């Protein structure tokens, strides 16, 4: 089966969950015996994207003459030329994100990551484009059952064209972090030696609810005393970062809030391993990859009780209303104060995380493409 995977390789810089999904599926499609893969991208400019693109071995590679964002903008205005002009004949064009890509004969598969986010936060023009993308797709790949429900509620004509293909955690998150990696974590983060910390892994976006997370954790006596740090892995726009810095400053001079940006992948594994817990009060999640990564590394998870997170965390989570600072504080307080229950849920979390491996997700993707030819 001839499959063309279309994605923007410049997104390799500070990869979000969507990009991690795209690259993980791409790399496994390249090894799938039933797939003849071509990888197609717009002009690659960022050094991180160029490094990935040049190192990609196995599949045929096609780089278009315009940046991905520019050619997608052109295709929105005029669905021509078809992507087969560059790729040659294809059975499927697979988009790991919500892209509109015109084809000559190939069927189109697009991935839906977070319909509710689009409905709640995107402007009307983008929502109209999403409807067009779903209306013209032959197959829609949905990353969670919650997202599928939202998709079919908003776009009922998609019924019969949706397949479940979840996100996952990379295999190395299921392996213990090396002792030397763990030993360097606090020094690399700029934390005092031996200090425990709560962890957040999320882009600095309003829907991730990080300012409320800071205010809620600042109510913990250990945090205000400087005996428990809070580490926010992520990055974002200057305005959102300013809001978070101001919220952290309001917690008092002894509180320790650390915002180190995005570390390399193996360093992130060690950061998870050393954390006391992951706190993830996101207002809107179509999946929630950090919850799986944390459970795979054997740390407890305090999760929002809404959108897809209860589906992903199952019985392993300490759940809270993400709009209520008192509820977030209480969930973390309970997690900290119940060592026996914490150990029980950590064991549950490891078992739950095993369901979310990329080889399983890739098998579901390949089967969906085969079933919908």
Show which residues each predicted segment covers.
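Carbohydrate transferase catalytic cores enriched for Leloir-type hexosyltransferases
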Residues: 1-373
């Amino acid at each position: 089966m001839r499959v063309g995977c279309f994605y923007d390789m410049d997104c390799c810089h500070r990869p979000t969950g969507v990009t991690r999904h795209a690259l993980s599926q791409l790399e496994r499609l390249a090894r799938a015996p039933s797939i003849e893969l071509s990888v197609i991208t717009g002009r690659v400019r960022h050094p991180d994207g160029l490094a990935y693109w040049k190192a990609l071995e196995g599949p045929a590679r096609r780089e278009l003459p315009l940046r991905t964002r520019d050619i997608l903008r052109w295709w929105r205005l005029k669905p021509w030329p078809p992507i087969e002009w560059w790729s040659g004949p294809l059975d499927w064009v697979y988009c790991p994100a919500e892209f509109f890509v015109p084809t000559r004969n190939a069927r189109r598969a697009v991935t839906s990551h977070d319909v509710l986010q689009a409905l709640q936060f995107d402007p009307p023009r983008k929502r109209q484009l999403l409807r067009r993308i779903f209306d013209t797709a032959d197959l829609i790949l949905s990353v969670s059952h919650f997202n599928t429900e939202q998709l079919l509620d908003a776009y009922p004509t998609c019924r019969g064209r949706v397949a479940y293909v979840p996100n996952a955690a990379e295999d190395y998150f299921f392996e213990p972090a090396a002792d030397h990696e763990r030993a360097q974590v606090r020094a690399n983060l700029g934390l005092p030696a031996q200090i425990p910390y709560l962890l957040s892994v999320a882009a600095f976006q309003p829907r991730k609810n990080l300012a409320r997370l800071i205010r809620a954790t600042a109510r913990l006596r250990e945090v205000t005393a400087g005996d428990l740090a809070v580490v926010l892995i992520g990055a974002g726009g200057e305005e959102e970062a300013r809001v978070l810095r101001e919220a952290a400053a309001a917690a008092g001079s002894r509180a320790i809030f650390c915002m180190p940006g995005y570390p390399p992948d193996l360093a992130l594994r060690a950061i998870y391993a050393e954390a006391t817990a992951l706190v993830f009060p996101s207002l809107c999640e179509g999946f929630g990859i950090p919850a799986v990564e944390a459970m795979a590394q054997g740390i407890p998870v305090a999760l929002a009780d809404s959108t897809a997170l209860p589906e992903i965390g199952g019985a392993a989570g300490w759940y809270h209303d993400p709009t209520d600072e008192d509820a977030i504080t209480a969930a973390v307080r309970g997690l900290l104060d119940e060592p026996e229950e914490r150990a029980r849920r950590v064991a549950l979390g490891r078992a739950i995380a095993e369901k979310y491996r990329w080889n399983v997700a890739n098998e579901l993707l390949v089967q969906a493409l085969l079933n919908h030819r």
